[in-house]
């Protein structure tokens, strides 16, 4: 295998290695895929404003998330069905996250169980939760996560319906026999209807409670003592409401473009959300992060940390646990270099003054 020098190269390699149906499931987004492109392009409109002649002989990227110390502000977002990428699936991902001393978020659409991932080894892990019609199932999942030592619930709020991912329809996406949705283990997966071209999506969507609303977050807090991070927010209004309903944190996300197309890039909405949160809760962010420079820009605009998704899946597909370790290492190295060249020796030293946004440039021009 050729030397991989950045995480984007893993995606290109995975495109040639994975079955088309699997690659498209991971890579292709909703409808016109405008948001997918914008998630990446928005970073190119944010420029650096470095500070020079600073002693950067020692760079400290460590930080604390909900009281847990991690080595860097880069964490693993919840993504589905890792065994489609590699036989060890989420177990390999969990080991790589632990080796990097960072947080892994296990998807409730995982191909390994909550307990199996816990047994993969030590590490700080969060559990992503969708709200299903069967509240007993939801409560059981939470109890299992608590018993297994997961440290927080990541509640997905932007997917009451699944986005229309046309590639899955064309490919008639279904699960191979050796991969299953572990949260549905014991249920009749023969119920998955293959006739509509996207059997998995149709079956899982049918289990999601489309009536779920803000008041149900209060119910969730009655069945768990774990902090609840609300994932899928991109506006100040929803940030305010989430905090009012007791969210322990916000994870800004547009689902990587997989849900509603023509959403703005999360990085473009970050300052609005951070201003509304006003330090009351941490604001994390995902969607489109592919470089350490992207991470730096988010931190400069007020994010408390960044979650990555697809780079994990594609690096896992190419080289298993070692691939995910390498992807995390490359992002860490890129962030370290960016911090040093910007004059920052710790995450806390990264400030708004280190970047210039498109809005900044417009304001400057208007004063001329």
UniProtKB/Swiss-Prot annotation:
EC number(s) recorded for this UniProt protein: 1.1.3.15
Pfam families named among the record's database cross-references: FMN_dh
Amino acids binding glyoxylate: 165, 255, 258
PROSITE patterns recorded: FMN_HYDROXY_ACID_DH_1, FMN_HYDROXY_ACID_DH_2
Catalytic reaction annotation: glycolate + O2 = glyoxylate + H2O2
Sequence ranges assigned to domain FMN hydroxy acid dehydrogenase in this UniProt record: 1-360
Residues given in the record as FMN binding sites: 78-80, 107, 128-130, 156, 231, 253, 286-290, 309-310
Record GO biological process: oxidative photosynthetic carbon pathway; photorespiration; regulation of photosynthesis; response to other organism; symbiont entry into host cell
Cofactor: how and how many bound: Binds 1 FMN per subunit.
Record keywords, A-Z: Flavoprotein, FMN, Glycolate pathway, Oxidoreductase, Peroxisome, Photorespiration
GO molecular function, one term: (S)-2-hydroxy-acid oxidase activity
Motif segment (Microbody targeting signal): 366-368
Family from the record: Belongs to the FMN-dependent alpha-hydroxy acid dehydrogenase family.
PANTHER family listed in its UniProt record: GLYCOLATE OXIDASE 2, S -2-HYDROXY-ACID OXIDASE-RELATED
Assembly, per entry: Homotetramer.
Name of the protein this chain belongs to: Glycolate oxidase 2
Organism: Oryza sativa subsp. indica (Rice)
Recorded name of the encoding gene: GLO2
